[in-house]
Each structure stands twice: as C-alpha cells, then as structure tokens.
Regions:
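Non-cysteine beta-strand/loop elements that form the S-adenosyl-L-methionine
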Residues: 132-150, 204-217
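Surface-exposed amphipathic alpha-helices with a cationic face
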Residues: 109-112, 135, 168-178, 242-250
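Auxiliary Fe-S-binding modules of radical SAM enzymes
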Residues: 2-16, 22-23, 188-256
Length: 256
C-alpha cells in the first residue's frame, strides 16, 4: 500500500459535526471521528454514507475530518448515561489520516477520563500507538477485521488496507499488553480458514459473519470468485471455521 500516493488522490475536508455521540443498535453508542475511509474496501456497507453527505467521489477517495469532535464529546458526555461506545461504525478510526489528526486518540482520552467502556473496530496497526492508553481503561477491547489469510485475496477486496500479517501482529501485541482483543472474520472471504492457527493465543474471541451486501459482486465476477458468493460457500466456511476454532480452544460466535 503506497500511503503517500493514496493521500494525493484523496479529497480531505475539515467539517463541523452537529453531534458526535450517537445511539447505536450494535452498542449503546457509536462515535465516528471521520466520514469516509481511506481503506476503500470494495464490500464496505458504509459507502451508503455518500447519499447522506453529498459526496460524488468514489468510495475510498474522500474523508471528512470532524474537527470539532472533541469539543462536542466533552459537552455531550455530561448529558448522557454511561454506556459502551463503539468506535467506529462507518469509518476506520485508525485510517492513515488519524496519524496526523489524532481525533480517535483524543476521543479515547475523554472517554477514559469519564470511565466509559469502549470497543474499537479497525484494520490498522496504528492502534498500537494508543496501546498504553487502552490498557488504562477499566473496560476496553480492540477488534481487528481480518477476512482472509491470503494476501492476494486481501488485495482484491481491501486494496488500501494494511496487510493481514500486520493486523495479526498488532492483535498479538495488544493482547500481550493486556488489552482484550477479538477478530471479526467478516465478511468471510476465500482462504479465511488459514487465519485460525495464526490467531491461537492472540485473541479473546472471534466473530464470524457472511457477506451481507452486494457492493462487491462485480469484484467476485471480475476475478472468477463467483463460487464464494453463494450460501453453500458461506455455510461450508462457517462450519470449517467453527470446527477449527474449537480445536484451537478459541471462543467464537457465529453471526449467521
């Protein structure tokens, strides 16, 4: 991944959000420090945000930076009942721009000060920057989305995301630092079963889900992967992964 070249093609805007701490069906609350995501994963459901934000750019080619996120959170957190916060639902909170803007880190500092529990969902080893801060939380967990063990498959579906090996290494480092960790194998892609042995001793649990959207149908067809789009594939992989995780003694949950 050539991050410098990717950023040259990125439309980045500074925006002022109206709110930052939102109710969520996945957790009690969700915080999205950014609109859009540099990873540009072909299957990402969050591309629906284009409809609500007026972006005409291709998904993965725009990011709005919520410059007032910290001020908003400091005000809103005083008015809300304590609950678990999911960071994030429609962006990767540790996408490359986070290295510069540090919105996610500053958000974590506010949540930690007020003793709010947090769940982070990312594909980026940049989260290691905040390992010490996360270890100080009373209740924090970090989840990595890893959909395949095969780098060739990863490049097809997640062209600008960090390599699988970097994610596995980051999970291991966080787990060793005492941070609760999980991996979300979702959507299940070809060669996902190769992840199980790599995750032994590195995660507290694994979540497994199928492809639930059709944004990436053209990718499957372009690369001759139609076999991996149907129910038979997902059901077979579900059982294969479940059996392998059970053998390795890894706690897991099937989401389909």
């Amino acid at each position: 991944m050539n991050v410098q070249k990717m950023l040259m093609c990125m439309i980045v805007k500074q925006v002022y959000a109206k709110t930052i701490l939102s109710k969520s069906k996945v957790s009690d609350y969700t915080i999205n420090p950014y609109v859009g995501c540099e990873h540009g994963c072909t299957y990402c459901y969050a591309r629906f945000m284009k409809r609500w934000t007026g972006h005409k750019e291709e998904w993965g080619r725009f990011v709005d930076v919520k410059t007032n996120a910290i001020d908003l959170l400091q005000r809103e957190i005083r008015k809300k009942r304590v609950g678990k916060v999911w960071i994030s639902g429609v962006c990767d909170p540790y996408q490359p721009l986070e290295k510069k803007h540090e919105l996610t880190r500053n958000i974590l500092e506010v949540l930690s000060k007020h003793n709010w529990p947090v769940t982070i969902q990312t594909k980026s080893p940049l989260v290691l920057r905040d390992a010490e801060l996360l270890s100080e939380f009373g209740d924090a967990e970090v989840g990595f989305t890893i959909t395949t063990a095969d780098e060739n498959v990863r490049r097809i579906f997640e062209p600008n995301a960090p390599p699988v090996s970097e994610r596995v290494k980051a999970v291991d480092e966080l787990h060793s630092a005492g941070v609760k960790t999980f991996v979300m194998i979702a959507p299940v892609l070809p060669k996902a079963e190769g992840l199980v042995e790599q995750l032994r001793g590195k995660v507290d649990y694994v979540l497994i889900d199928r492809m639930n959207y059709h944004y990436a149908d053209w990718v499957y067809r372009k690369y001759g992967l139609e076999y991996a789009m149907n129910n038979n594939f997902f059901n077979h992989k579900k059982m294969e992964l479940a059996n392998a995780l059970k053998r390795e003694g890894i706690t897991y949950q099937l989401l389909f």
